[in-house]
């Protein structure tokens, strides 16, 4: 099947369907995997696809079947159980598909950027609660999503002193924006910015970040999210925090972009050494 043009899936009889999260379907084909639209062989016979024309129905105990509802013009999947498996998303997983949005399963722990290679319509990625590693620096071929959205993430949370990590979790930010409005984060840090394909990017802050000075309106009264643009010259080991009403961008004194951004001290509180 040429996934570069298909807009919905008709699941052949005998195939195994697993609804992972939202509309994302894991289609395991019984035959040997063929080449991708680009001619490359995928690493397995699993094809990930967002199928908006397929409506999952949770009918526990029923066999897997696929029907088409003429009244709603939607395909209906009926399957025996909701199977959620631990999975990392890797190279070619979505390659060549016309998807516009990806929901990672809550159990997904990591992904690499080339799993979305040549998906020119991809706009948003929703990352589940178990995610601890994002690498988007290899999203090329017109693929880079516009925004990564974290929701209910249990590996990144914060208290009154800033970001608390359960382990050495890192968000590798490269070419995309990051939406953390649905997380309790009050601090965001990175230790690898200089190694990525950098562009100016936007952080969408959660409602827990509200300024008491009136100079900022972050996640506050306005209907549109407030955005902060980080310069591409930002080096590793910066931390952005909101503590006791003060927004602080901690950057090492050796940061090459530090002098350029001293002019923004009316907007930021600088701490020269972490």
Each PLM stretch: what is its role?
Residues 24-31, 173-178, 259-264:
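Short, surface-exposed terminal/edge motifs of secreted or surface/virion proteins that either
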Residues 37-44:
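Beta-strand/beta-sandwich contexts
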Residues 60-65:
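N-terminal accessory interaction module
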Residues 44-55, 69-87, 95-110, 119-133, ...:
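Structural signature of tandem-repeat unit edges
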Residues 1-37:
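Enriched but not universal
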């Amino acid at each position: 099947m040429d996934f570069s043009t298909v807009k919905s899936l008709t699941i052949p009889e005998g195939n195994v369907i697993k609804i992972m999260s939202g509309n994302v379907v894991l289609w395991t084909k019984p035959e040997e995997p063929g080449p991708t639209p680009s001619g490359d062989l995928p690493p397995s016979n699993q094809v990930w696809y967002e199928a908006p024309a397929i409506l999952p129905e949770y009918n526990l105990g029923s066999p897997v079947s696929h029907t088409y509802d003429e009244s709603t013009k939607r395909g209906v999947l009926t399957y025996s159980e909701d199977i959620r498996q631990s999975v990392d998303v890797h190279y070619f997983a979505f390659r060549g598909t016309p998807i516009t949005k990806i929901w990672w399963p809550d159990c997904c722990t990591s992904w690499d950027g080339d799993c979305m290679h040549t998906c020119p319509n991809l706009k948003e990625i929703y990352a589940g609660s178990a995610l601890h590693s994002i690498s988007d620096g290899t999203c090329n071929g017109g693929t880079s999503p516009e925004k990564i959205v974290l929701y209910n993430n249990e590996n990144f949370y914060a208290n009154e002193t800033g970001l608390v990590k359960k382990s050495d979790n890192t968000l590798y930010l490269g070419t995309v924006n990051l939406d953390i409005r649905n997380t309790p984060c009050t601090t965001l840090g990175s230790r690898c910015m200089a190694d990525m394909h950098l562009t100016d990017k936007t952080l969408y802050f959660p409602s827990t970040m509200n300024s008491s000075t009136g100079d900022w309106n972050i996640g506050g009264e306005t209907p549109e999210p407030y955005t902060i643009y980080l310069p591409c010259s930002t080096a590793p080991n910066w931390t952005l925090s909101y503590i006791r009403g003060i927004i602080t961008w901690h950057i090492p004194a050796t940061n090459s972009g530090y002098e350029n951004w001293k002019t923004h001290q009316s907007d930021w509180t600088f701490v020269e050494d972490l």
